Structures are given as C-alpha cells and as structure tokens.
C-alpha cells in the first residue's frame, strides 16, 4: 500500500548525506545494503514518530481497493505492535488515503496469523508463512527470493487476479 523503502532512502539521505537507492534492487535488504556501523541507527527509523504519517500511496492502490470492496469484504491488517509510535500515524494515513474503509475493518495487530480471511496480500514473509488462508506476496526488494507464493508486482496485478 505504501512505499516504506522510499522512506528509508529519504531518512538515510538526511542522516548520512549518502544515497541508499540500492535498497530498491530486488534481493536487497537493510541488512545487506546498509554499512554495519549504521545499521542499528537505520533500524530505529520506523520507531520514530512520523515515520508512517505521510508515506506515499502506491500507484493504483486506492482505486483497486475501492473496486475490490464492491465485490469483497475488505479488511486492512497492519502489524503495528512492533513500532509503538505508529498507531495514530497509520490510522490517520488510512483515513486520508482509504476513507471508504470503515474503522471496523482496520485491524492493528502484531501477528497477522490471527486474521481469519480467505486471502492476505503482504510483503513480509513472516506474515505470509503463518497465514492459514491463501497468502499472496506483494513485491518488494526484500522478498524477491520468495517463490512459493502468487506474486503481485503492482496493484494492477491485484485487480487482474481478483476482478477479472
């Protein structure tokens, strides 16, 4: 739904005055891209107030989710427990970008395996591998190695899968 990788690149540039765009290369992660002496500081970026507040929405996300909502009951599950300052930012982001999703269909959780839906679209392997329904991977550089899931490279792929 958002470009979290872009936020890491932006904050890295501000903090170290260096480019981290290599993070966008498929297969790259923070752990294999950031110099070891900076990694601990970079891993703290999402723990800062405001990290999630104004993340850009991915192209097509709003339109496709709105179309999906006409055929399916849509829930947004976000793993918010890891980053204690993100609740308000994430909720405000959802109200701004997906105002048609009712608050009753927004789930803040730590472990997405509790979500009892038919499908889960996620970029994190830890969420996909514990999901009991059909896990679907949304492409991000850190999950390029995943081969066992149906993969969506963009929101048009999601529309093609569910709306055709």
Question: Can you describe what each PLM-predicted range is?
Answer:
Residues 73-75, 119, 136:
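A structural signal for isolated positions on well-ordered beta-strands in alpha/beta enzyme cores
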Residues 1-41:
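Active-site neighborhood of HAD-like aspartate-dependent phosphohydrolases
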